């Protein structure tokens, strides 16, 4: 992308920021004083998100700044619980994910923690014990990484700053961003927007809640798996000859959504349209993220759509989400699609049934791996 295009998107981003502020969606940036305590253990949780206006491609990889803002809703297809321990004299961070050392998340965590330590002048290391709880076995495109990023970030904030700052979702979202861009939005309940664009003040590169959970919208997902990495999609997208025009459309859509106070019916339409455009962008770069199974489901949905207002969307994976104000439409569709299906709800207390066992498990792990 050339300098003139980047300058244009910075200008468009500044206008979006001003609009959000004028409409009362931006909250004040709070500063907190770190108070890390050696051996302190903190625990937090998060649920994943599903995007209406999506993002692909980082303008600033080092600081995890996307080329465009993105909008999503919280879902309950899974959840993540994370425990964090501070080691004042430690030299090496550790990450245990689902019972094993995970090199991918260790690299992401180290990047974020180095950034965090430098910003707040903190020495020492952090140990994370993380577990994901899924309502499915194996799938791609259900935003697990967003829940992991948000849970880890909130546990870290609680450990270093205390309970109060850990309740500041905007503050938490800034550091979730460093693990996963979508993690910014998973730091919030309801519907949220991640304000991100070229040249943004990094203090404001965070997510902001813009609406409650849309309880009058029914939703669910057909989980499907592919081994395509999200990072591959990011790198392919920015090379597409259609990428800049896609971004222009997104800025125009987001401007309209702000003007209409993030009307849920418009968000449903945006989610479907943007999913199709995202797949076209990746296809133009030679990356096909849908599978034969997901294409069959999409065809069935398209054939069924003439029966009423049923919408679909997907992110960087073949798992297809359906949404409607009319639950009977989804139930009728499912009669013609026999694939495994997860019904979404607005029950965001599922984690409580596992919290005690997780806490015991994490404490036992930390006890076995004592701070020297």
From Swiss-Prot:
The record's listing under Gene3D superfamilies reads: 3.30.230.10, GHMP kinase, C-terminal domain
Q: What catalytic reaction does the record list? A: (R)-3,5-bisphosphomevalonate + H(+) = isopentenyl phosphate + phosphate + CO2
Residue ranges crossing the lipid bilayer per the database entry: none
Please state the Enzyme Commission number of this protein: 4.1.1.110
> If you read the UniProt record, what top EC class would you report for this enzyme, in one word?
lyase
One of the record's GO molecular function terms = carboxy-lyase activity
Alphabetized UniProt keyword annotations: Isoprene biosynthesis, Lipid biosynthesis, Lipid metabolism, Lyase
List, alphabetically, the SUPFAM superfamilies matched: GHMP Kinase, C-terminal domain, Ribosomal protein S5 domain 2-like
Write down the Pfam families for this protein, in alphabetical order.
Answer: MVD-like_N (PF22700)
Which Gene Ontology BP annotations are present? isopentenyl diphosphate biosynthetic process, mevalonate pathway
Q: What residue range is the signal peptide?
A: none
Q: Which InterPro entries match?
A: GHMP_kinase_C_sf, Mev_decarb, MVD-like_N, MVD_Decarboxylase, Ribosomal_Su5_D2-typ_SF, Ribsml_uS5_D2-typ_fold_subgr
Pathway-wise, it operates in: Isoprenoid biosynthesis; isopentenyl diphosphate biosynthesis via mevalonate pathway
Subunit text: Homodimer.
Its UniProt miscellaneous note says: It is proposed that Thermoplasmatales adapted the classical archaeal mevalonate pathway by replacing mevalonate 5-phosphate decarboxylase (MMD) with two specialized enzymes (mevalonate-3-phosphate 5-kinase and mevalonate 3,5-bisphosphate decarboxylase) in order to produce isoprenoids in extremely acidic environments. It was found that at low pH, the dual function enzyme MMD is unable to carry out the first phosphorylation step, yet retains its ability to perform decarboxylation.
Tell me its family: Belongs to the mevalonate 3,5-bisphosphate decarboxylase family.
Write down what this protein is called: Mevalonate 3,5-bisphosphate decarboxylase
